[in-house]
Amino acid sequence: MDKYQNPLEERYASKEMLYNFSPNMKFKTWRKLWIILAECEKELGLDIITDEQIEELKKYADDVNYDVAKDYEKKLRHDVMAHVHAYGDQATNAKKIIHLGATSAYVGDNTDIIQIKEALIIIKKKLITLLYRLSKFADDYKALPTLGFTHFQAAQLTTVGKRATLWMHSVVMDIEELEFRLNSL
């Protein structure tokens, strides 16, 4: 009860989506991005980066020392630099190459894109599940008569199953839109 809680998150968000936008996911992604940065810099010829340093970064990638980072953030008043120092305290041989040549936007902006892409993948999976369930519903109610509607008034006779196939069509179009967005990220 000591911190702000959003009712949308508490009532409606899945555990998978909550984790995707959690601080834990964010900071682990920062570490993965720092590893990728070091690997690319080494590959491009920055010879001060060694394989041993990269392996040390990988060793601590999922072991985020939050209390240490919190202490650094109080001193530095900068979240990225706090995590650079905290990671460096764990991977002491790699300390000098963490975040080398990068700006805070490197980890911040790329993490945002990664989290957005993962969220869209979660949504796509849920839409595919919805499509499957709607197909079962449409089949179960293919013979149940109902009135169709057009221009907000009753029209000709149709079936509940037929109406469900129209809902499915909308979901298919949503999935196609998601796939387009995913491919453009």
What does each model-found stretch correspond to?
Residues 1-185:
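A helix-coil-helix interface module used to build multimeric assemblies
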